[in-house]
Curated annotation (Swiss-Prot):
Propeptide feature: residues: 21-53
Tissue expression per record: Expressed by the venom duct.
Annotated protein name in UniProt: Conotoxin TxMMSK-02
Signal peptide extent: 1-20
Annotated positions of the 4-hydroxyproline modification: 66
Residue numbers bearing the Tyrosine amide modification: 69
Location of the protein in the cell: Secreted
Organism annotation: Conus textile (Cloth-of-gold cone)
Length: 70
C-alpha cells in the first residue's frame, strides 16, 4: 500500500513540476510591461504640452499621466 502511495505521490510531483515551467518571453506574462510602455506620452498625444514635456495638468488621462497628481 505504501509503495503505491509513494508511486502516486512521485507521479503527481513530476506532473506538477512540468506544469510549473516558466513562460516564454512572448507569452502573457510580459504583456503588462508592454502596456506600461504604451502609456508614455509622445508629441503626438493631443494633451501633450511641449513646453512642460508632459500633459496638461487639468486634462489628466490614463494614456498621458507623467505630470498628473505629482
Amino acid at each position: 500500500m505504501m509503495s503505491k502511495l509513494g508511486a502516486l505521490l512521485t507521479i503527481c510531483l513530476l506532473l506538477f513540476s512540468l506544469t510549473a515551467v516558466p513562460l516564454d518571453g512572448d507569452q502573457h506574462a510580459d504583456q503588462p510591461a508592454q502596456r506600461l510602455q504604451d502609456r508614455i506620452p509622445t508629441e503626438d498625444h493631443p494633451l501633450f504640452d511641449p513646453n512642460k514635456r508632459c500633459c496638461d495638468d487639468s486634462e489628466c488621462s490614463y494614456s498621458c499621466w507623467p505630470c498628473c497628481y505629482g
